[in-house]
Regions:
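Bacterial Sec-dependent N-terminal signal peptides
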Residues: 1-23, 796, 805, 858
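Beta-propeller folds
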Residues: 21-617, 622-628, 632-633, 921, ...
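Surface beta-strand/loop "capping" patches
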Residues: 373, 561-568, 653-668, 935
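Hydrophobic/aromatic beta-strand patches that form the interior of the parallel beta-sheet core
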Residues: 391, 413, 485, 631, ...
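Glycine-rich His-Gly loop
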Residues: 417, 578, 622, 692-696, ...
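Cap/lid segment of the alpha/beta-hydrolase catalytic domain
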Residues: 490-502, 637-639, 644-764, 768-770, ...
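Active-site-proximal cap/loop segments of hydrolase catalytic domains
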Residues: 705-943
Length: 943
């Protein structure tokens, strides 16, 4: 498919308006900070109010509170982490200190306890009033409809809240705090105070000396732990319950020691917590249960409880959790802590050592990364409240037990990974044995061995399901009948990814969910949704009627109600749609067996949300030129209205356009890619072209890229605004030949573009990519000289040495990447040594004639930065132009704003010099000596 003629026609159309176009600006690095994103959008339960954050990339953001129908809008500066009350009458949120105030506090070297802190903001819908309470620690709301909320204020830190002039309405109308709060603050500062508050009535209850609190999901109770610390004795802890709406407080328990990990059941009738009376640092805890209706308090589990493994007790690193029906209390047990002997050695008198043992389940490097997690490890148990019995469910051999969402079923799914831990070093997968676990007795039965993908419980707890990689099918285990059924056998199409080009099993397309009562499981093939009987008695049913496959449209059910565990086919079901050929997207409905199109177009539609109690929807819509603002509509989607405008300044800048292109690679396979052109494109001119790639990218035809400082890659919007064409080819791979596969796709695609479009300057083309893309660049410059300059981020240059390397962020060894996953060698170093050498750029550095800029950071947790060093010193040894940017203490992709800004400047200076003929910057021509580090940036251009 050739570049659509409409694009070329558009270019001539634009030429007719050059006078207007010249008024626009080109994007610069100074523009990044003010470009905004939209985050955390949500609808009120009735769908009448929308709330979302609008945040610049650097600076103070804002919270937008908008009435959907009228468009009336309120903006709260610096507000974030908003929660709409389940009753739908107000929204509460954090309010940050001003960024400038925080910065000044750091400049002034204020202590942590003196730093400015968040405030609480509450906005009641339909008013212009904003309540603000300083020194917020946290707040919470129940799950069920209610007007109540609870929050903690740290009275001792109120003075650290910034003093600022009142903001104009409706941002800050200056209302007084809720009744009783200001007066109490004047009398004393008791530390952390819990306020239980109803913003609709002003009713408030305070609980001093609060340590932690929790709200019952039903919204009828707040429980808290209070603590009064004593210097010479144990602290006095109390469990306080406050009933709603009456605000009746009750002391449930009072003891000297330590209480923690408070839990409450759904109706607010039972409380649980851990308590220890130990005075030592290593504390043993007991589990307590309070039943409100009976006003009964019991220690229900301790280290000597029947059923407790020897030497174990309730773990302080696990918070108890009630089942939905309140009949079970789940918690974790762990070995009892032992007091460490007194240490009298000085630091310089101790050895420091890691011992790597060949039979360790995990490498030492991985153990050290996970050290805190391993120390906090505990094993799930259950206390059956009616029976008064404890059952241990998980243990060292089977450390994980999954339950149904409401934890009401009598069986769970156990998972044991220990038999396969060592081999994960080179397989990279996560095989496990699956067990059916009886929650009443703790008995377990092994159901499957070496299950590798997508194991889960059905929502009703009647079945276990997993994808069997050997048979490429979905298997279901019936908990009661203890039988296994191949449920996808009747689906006439693959239920796995047919495009898989990794030397490992193909991943399944996944599950859409289950129908009520676990009556059917919904399974995806590439395009459609299938209804399958988990017992295998009824024939499979294609719910979408083959429409997806017939039209090359991938249909996926949207889960829009977090309270719903099932897919209810008796109601309207919404599906997302993506056309794999044209890259168009949209939404469909499935109702009464009929599939209907709601919305479909040349956009990327995403982030669909629905109001809890109304047919009101939010979604995002974007193209390369259109920012993904928020749109809203009712159920038919026919009258969509845009309710945000995050970046109106974009209209004043040159941008660009993108088209889907096709070509034949050197093996005559048809590939797709994306070609981006400048907005003020003139087909009579030639333009330098940057070629960027990773693997497959054409599905992102309508992805929008806000101008942003680079983490590691080019910004396509910045490039087209500044006169670059950008080509992004798809790459397909052959096992054992990752480098040559990249060459086949990228070089063939680049040649096809320059032969097809004379406006591409074939003498001024560059390469850019990061990580796997960086490796492919390092390989390409050893195979071709058609590119004038290349920039590679975090490249693997030597697969031989990288094979035995460590991914330091996780501690994992890298062997699995070459044998099973992305690097695609498909065998070990000793099985396929030639493949490792042939695909390693380091062995062919003498062929390189392309100037190469690399970025490889010394805290890279994915690709050891020694790989960049190997490439650098080899090219330096051969006198070839090469530079390496090493951002100190930075990760695989840059995280710190100053580093991102710096990389953006240097990367585009590099390309501008080689591809546009602009003067070289000082750093590129002369470097920067270590003696000038941090003092000289070298940005100045040298004529």
């Amino acid at each position: 498919m050739y570049l659509r003629s409409g694009l070329i026609a558009l270019c001539f159309f634009l030429l007719a308006f050059t006078g207007v176009a010249q008024e626009k600006k080109r994007l610069s690095h100074d523009d990044y900070a003010g470009w905004k994103t939209i985050n955390r959008s949500q609808l009120s339960p009735a769908g009448d109010w929308a709330v979302f954050e609008v945040n610049p990339q650097d600076g103070d953001g804002e919270l937008v509170i908008r009435h959907v129908e009228s468009g009336r809008q309120f903006v709260v500066p610096r507000a974030y982490r908003a929660s709409i009350s389940p009753g739908g009458k107000y929204v509460a949120f954090h309010i940050k200190p001003q960024q400038a105030v925080e910065r000044q506090a750091k400049v002034d070297k204020k202590r942590r306890e003196e730093m400015p802190v968040d405030s609480l903001g509450i906005f009641v819908f339909g008013t212009a009033g904003l309540e603000k309470f300083p020194a917020l620690q946290s707040f919470a709301m129940p799950e069920d409809p209610s007007d109540w909320m609870a929050y903690i204020i740290d009275q001792a830190r109120i003075e650290t809240v910034e003093e600022e002039s009142p903001e104009p309405e409706p941002e800050d109308p200056g209302q007084e705090p809720a009744s009783g709060q200001e007066e109490e603050t004047k009398k004393e500062k008791p530390g952390r105070v819990l306020y239980i508050y109803n913003p609709m009535t002003g009713a408030v209850k305070e609980v001093k000396h609060i340590s932690a609190f929790i709200m019952a999901p039903a919204g009828n109770l707040v429980a808290g732990l209070t603590v009064k610390e004593n210097k010479d004795t144990l602290s006095l802890y109390e469990v306080i319950s406050v009933g709603l709406p009456g605000l009746t407080a009750k002391t449930v328990d009072s003891r000297y020691g330590e209480m923690k990990n408070l839990a409450v059941d759904r109706p607010g009738e039972q409380l649980a917590w851990l308590f220890s009376s130990d005075t030592t640092k290593a504390k043993s805890f007991d589990l307590y249960l309070y039943q409100q209706r009976r006003d009964r308090l019991n220690q229900v589990v301790g280290s000597s409880t029947s059923g407790m493994p020897a030497g174990y007790g309730p773990s302080e690193n696990s918070t108890p959790r009630f089942s939905h029906n309140g009949e079970r209390l789940f918690f974790g047990n762990a070995p009892l802590p032992e007091e460490e002997p007194e240490d009298t050695l000085l630091a310089e008198e101790k050895y420091r050592l890691d011992i790597w043992h060949w039979e360790d389940p995990m490498l030492q490097s991985q153990q050290l990364v996970m050290l805190n997690q391993l120390r906090r490890r505990n094993f799930q148990a259950v206390y059956h409240i009616r029976q008064g019995t404890m059952v241990q469910l998980a243990d060292e051999d089977m450390p994980s037990v999954s339950l149904d969402p409401e934890s009401n079923a009598t069986r769970g799914m156990g998972q044991a990974t220990a038999p396969y831990m060592i081999e994960r070093q080179w397989t990279g997968g996560n095989p496990r044995d699956l067990y059916a676990v009886d929650l009443l007795t703790g008995q377990r039965k092994r159901v499957a061995s070496r299950a590798e993908a997508n194991a889960a419980m059905s929502p009703g707890g009647n079945y276990m399901i997993w994808y069997d990689t050997g048979s490429t099918s979905w298997k279901v285990y019936h908990m009661q009948q203890e039988t296994i059924t191949d449920v996808s056998a009747g689906i006439p199409f693959p239920v796995y990814n047919e495009d898989n080009d990794l030397p490992m099993f193909a991943r399944p397309h996944g599950l859409a969910g289950w129908t009520p009562g676990d009556e059917a499981v919904l399974i995806y093939d590439r395009y459609d949704v299938w209804k399958v009987d988990p017992r295998g008695r009824r024939p499979v049913e294609n719910l979408t009627g083959g429409y997806g496959r017939e039209n090359n449209i991938r249909l996926r059910i949207q889960d829009l109600d977090e309270r719903e565990h099932f897919v209810r086919l008796d109601k309207k079901v919404l599906l997302s749609a993506f056309n794999e050929n044209a890259k168009r997207s949209g939404f469909y409905t499935l109702q009464d067996g009929r599939l209907s199109q709601l919305l479909m177009g040349d956009y990327l539609y995403s982030q669909l949300e629905r109001a809890r109690d109304a047919e009101r929807y939010l979604w995002r819509r974007s193209t390369y030129t259109e920012f993904p603002d928020i749109w809203t509509s009712t159920a038919d989607f026919s009258q969509g209205v845009k309710i945000s405008d995050a970046n109106p300044q974009q209209a004043g800048y040159y941008w660009g356009s993108v088209e889907l292109v096709e070509w034949q690679d050197f093996d005559n396979e048809t590939l797709q890619g994306l070609l981006y052109l400048p907005e003020d494109f003139d087909p009579a001119r030639t333009y330098p072209m940057l070629v960027y790639f990773y693997e497959r990218s054409s599905q992102g035809l309508h992805q929008h890229f806000i101008p942003a400082p680079s983490r590691s890659t080019i910004n396509r919007s910045y490039c087209t605004s500044n006169g670059y064409i950008v080509f992004v080819p798809d790459i397909t791979y052959k096992e054992g030949f990752p480098g040559e596969s990249a060459y086949n796709a990228i070089v063939s695609g680049t040649k096809a573009m320059v032969e097809r479009y004379p406006f591409i300057d074939r003498e001024n083309m560059g390469l850019q990519g990061q990580s796997w893309g960086g490796y492919q660049i390092a390989y390409l410059v050893t195979r071709t000289n058609m590119f004038k300059a290349a920039m590679a981020g975090a490249p693997v240059s030597n697969m031989v040495s990288a094979y035995g390397g460590i991914r330091w962020q996780t501690g994992l060894n890298r062997q699995f990447q070459y044998e099973q996953t992305q690097s695609r060698i498909g065998g070990t170093l000793w099985e396929r040594p030639i493949r490792y050498i042939e695909n390693s750029p380091i062995f062919f550095v003498d062929k390189i004639e392309t100037p190469l800029l690399m970025m490889h950071n010394d805290a890279d947790g994915a690709v050891p930065w020694y790989q960049g060093i190997e490439m650098f010193v080899a090219m330096r040894r051969l006198g070839k132009p090469v530079w390496m940017l090493n951002y100190n203490d930075e990760a695989h992709n840059l995280t710190r704003w100053p580093n991102r800004m710096d990389l953006s400047v240097r990367m585009y200076q590099f390309f501008d010099y080689y591809l546009k003929g602009e003067p070289a910057p000082q750093w590129l021509k002369y470097g920067i000596p270590a003696t000038d580090k941090g003092r000289v940036d070298g940005y100045e251009l040298v004529e």
